[in-house]
Amino acid sequence: LLKRPYGLLLICGPTGSGKTATLYAMLRMLNLEETKLICLEDPVEAEIKGAIQIGINEKIGFTFAKGLRSVLRQDPDTIMIGEIRDKETAELAVKSALTGHRVLSTIHTNTAIGVVTRLMDMGVEPYLIRATLMGAIAQRLVRKFDGTTYHGRTALFEYLEIPTNSVHWDQLEAHLLVSLEDSAREAVSQHVTSIEEVHRCG
């Protein structure tokens, strides 16, 4: 998905599921010598070499939406928005993707397919979602289990890739390359974690 020159890619999951860490990892995969990357974050959590990183400050009125408007004037190739929280930011993110930018962000919903519903609930027109959304990743963090004790954590992923903007919403499941259930089953079978831990994390 990162090879596509424009479109919207969203990472979702509950609070504390590692969404931002995944977002940072994906951004570091970009060739920043050839790609102009601007990040809007609240707060800036880690340095991304070669990127322009801007901290959001809602207390003084510098919101994601206002930051995104100013960023678009600088003509970036890729835009990272720390989180899509409201209708204004969602609409600006979608319209940025529509005008030839690669946009990556996080959004608060539980499943990759649920991203579509969440955007519509925020008031984004379905035709705009269809024209821009190229994929979504849902994730959970689970504790590793060695058979006797828990130590460290690992991620379970769900991966939705939308090949074209002609895909119908009722066909989205056909484009779910990996489900959270598949990922959990694999982690348990490889003795990475326990079935109890999977159930605990939902």
Predicted regions and their residues:
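Short, flexible helix-loop junctions that flank or precede catalytic/ligand sites
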Residues: 1-202
